[in-house]
């Protein structure tokens, strides 16, 4: 048999396999519940009504349970997937999950950039990642990932891209090493990636973390392992004496604090804003305290403070090419050893695809949603 015919036969066999033997099992929802979103989730077994023969078939390797996923189930997130009847459901439904990493199982003959075995992530949110398998009509809706572990691949679209764009897309940095950024929530996964990306660009970072008994131990990890230039407590962040006497010595005489990254809100936000130099920029990408942003009026009038929101999902919709560029550059930083994933923040939950019952799968996801204070990631065992 010729090489061409062999490839065509293999492609046909792979498509046939995807239609007949693959068991599609997904976490779906058709309604929302702002009080207990786990009540709207169901495990659904089905064969896709369309697309499996002419589409790219993907096997899920891992997906995180992100706050945005939970907010979608609650019905309070601005970005929501369309509810459809493509999954053989009685009523229009959506598959939960925005982020994850997949392995290509099969491709139609029209696809030239992907092959079975390739690792990919979705280009956009609302992909429906909480599933054993997915189909995708267009190869342009996927980003190929090479050379990183599944933990990194499964989180690069949100945490990795957020950190990279916060550091790189808004400020013209001086490469001489006098520029600073300040951020709260310094122990968060995004903040740990921010400090590493900044260090690779010769940017200094001042990371603010909550007061705690083991402050020195945590600060040492953030500085030595994740590259923060200096870690301070929220108490120090709010002290006038610290700001006047200690901080100038930390920053140095020629320092310019050009960027403040806020994911907390409330007083913490106001206090990091005070550390900005003239014409500094505040970017807000979260609000963990659930307190409104409060800024001293004088920062706007006399220091020219600028304050903007940041939403990586909207950035990706507005400029898909920049999303692809961002992912590729973040992956390159990982491969070059300039940044590492904060894997200690991740709690792995194993989904035994071949042995777990529907009830066990639902309980696994429910536990992941309800367990707070850690990043839960579901790893599919095949």
Curated annotation (Swiss-Prot):
Q: Where does the record say the transit peptide is?
A: 1-17
Enumerate the residues binding NADP(+).
159, 187-190, 210-212, 285-288, 310-312, 375
Q: Does the keyword Lipid metabolism apply?
A: yes
The Gene Ontology terms for molecular function here are: enoyl-[acyl-carrier-protein] reductase (NADPH) activity
Q: What keywords are assigned to this protein?
A: Fatty acid biosynthesis, Fatty acid metabolism, Lipid biosynthesis, Lipid metabolism, Mitochondrion, NADP, Oxidoreductase, Transit peptide
Q: Which GO cellular component terms, listed alphabetically, does the Swiss-Prot or TrEMBL entry include?
A: mitochondrial matrix
Q: Name one GO biological process term.
A: fatty acid biosynthetic process
The EC number(s) attached to this protein equal 1.3.1.104
Instruction: List the active site.
Output: 77 (proton donor)
What Pfam families has UniProt attached to this entry?
A: ADH_N
Q: Which coarse location class applies to the principal site listed for this UniProt protein?
A: mitochondrion
Instruction: Please write the reaction equations for the catalytic activity of this protein.
Output: a 2,3-saturated acyl-[ACP] + NADP(+) = a (2E)-enoyl-[ACP] + NADPH + H(+)
Give the similarity note.
Answer: Belongs to the zinc-containing alcohol dehydrogenase family. Quinone oxidoreductase subfamily.
Q: Which protein is depicted?
A: Enoyl-[acyl-carrier-protein] reductase, mitochondrial
Q: Which organism is it from?
A: Kluyveromyces lactis (strain ATCC 8585 / CBS 2359 / DSM 70799 / NBRC 1267 / NRRL Y-1140 / WM37) (Yeast)
Q: What is the lineage of its organism?
A: Eukaryota, Fungi, Dikarya, Ascomycota, Saccharomycotina
